[in-house]
Amino acid sequence: MRQCMDADNLHRRLKKIIGQVQAIDRMVDEDVPCEDVLSQINAAKSALNKCGQVVLEGHIQHCVRDGIQHGDADKTIESFTKAVERFSNMG
């Protein structure tokens, strides 16, 4: 699986998200206004969604392409459909 995505890019994004979530946790302790906390939650959610896009793009560029060219196209399409369904349920 690692070869089908830009692992360095993904790790960098995930570390940023971890920092955002830790900041949100501190905001709760510091009694920051709810609107500001919600804004930061939305930012972290958007960043996590972008991580999903990175994984899905890698899946398309590598796994799907390879599966269609060298494997079973029907199985590849089924796998791709499942990946898209899982990603679309992240919202």
Residue ranges of predicted features:
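Solvent-exposed interaction patches of small proteins and small membrane subunits
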Residues: 1-91
